[in-house]
Amino acid sequence: MLCTVYKSTRKADTYLFVKKRDCFDDVPEALMAMFGTPQLVMVFPIAKRESLGMADIHKVRAAIDENGYYLQIPPPQVNLLAEHKRNLGLQD
């Protein structure tokens, strides 16, 4: 199975994986509105891949099979200063 990846024009580091190029029928309208105009990143055979950069390949495959799409969002940013203060036992 081929997988097509698009990046969001509205949300940084946010990617949408779908089964077919330019086919967003399974993606909810509210998600598409938040995502913005999809920009094509790549098309690849997902069955032949063992890993992906930031996403768990098994979760991506399962989501595409069940929902027709997978949304990859960036991990939350860590406040390094607050973490350092916490490690030192200091309060904010």
Swiss-Prot record:
Entry protein name: YcgL domain-containing protein Sputw3181_2259
Source organism of this protein record: Shewanella sp. (strain W3-18-1)
Gene3D superfamilies: YcgL domain
Alphabetized Pfam families for the sequence: YcgL (PF05166)
Domain YcgL: start-end pairs: 1-85
InterPro entries per the UniProt record, alphabetical: YcgL-like_sf (IPR038068), YcgL_dom (IPR027354)
